[in-house]
């Protein structure tokens, strides 16, 4: 018997996985199209600066990395040309942090683990039929190229 999916998400990066988890939380059946993983010869040292809303969303998905992989930024001093400058302070704004610097591999792993344990998400190799398709492939999107949609 063929599987029925409510949505097909093309792209299993951070955005695609987070969207899949959010939709599954709403009881939707999700097909998540993931490209085959290739082993990298170099260590992934990428990091994202994520705001409080992103942290709150990832916390709600139980996908926020541990403290070793998410560093809060408490203060920031920006110096411009000449004598211009501006300072920001999380405590003065009543915020936990101005932003967090998050290791990309740790965040990707937390989201992948959450997807693996979500029964309403099925990771597939190729797009499947669904009433709705979300394109979360990033800049080099093969789907947009198929559709002739420039970015």
Predicted regions and their residues:
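Beta1/beta-strand and adjacent pyrophosphate-binding region of the FAD-binding site
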Residues: 2-15, 31
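Residue-level detector of anion-binding/catalytic polar loops
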Residues: 29, 64, 122
């Amino acid at each position: 018997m063929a599987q029925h999916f409510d949505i097909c998400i093309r792209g299993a990066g951070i955005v695609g996985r987070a969207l899949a988890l959010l939709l599954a939380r709403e009881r939707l059946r999700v097909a998540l199209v993931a490209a085959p993983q290739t082993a990298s010869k170099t260590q992934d040292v990428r990091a994202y600066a994520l705001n409080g809303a992103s942290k709150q969303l990832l916390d709600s998905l139980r996908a926020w990395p541990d403290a070793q992989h998410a560093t809060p930024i408490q203060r920031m001093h920006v110096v411009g040309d000449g004598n211009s400058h501006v300072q920001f302070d999380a405590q003065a704004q009543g915020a936990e942090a101005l932003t967090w610097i998050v290791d990309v591999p740790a965040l990707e792993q937390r989201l992948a683990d959450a997807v693996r344990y979500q029964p309403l998400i099925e990771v597939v190799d190729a797009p499947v039929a669904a009433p709705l398709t979300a394109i979360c492939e990033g800049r080099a999107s093969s789907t947009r190229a198929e559709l002739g949609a420039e970015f």
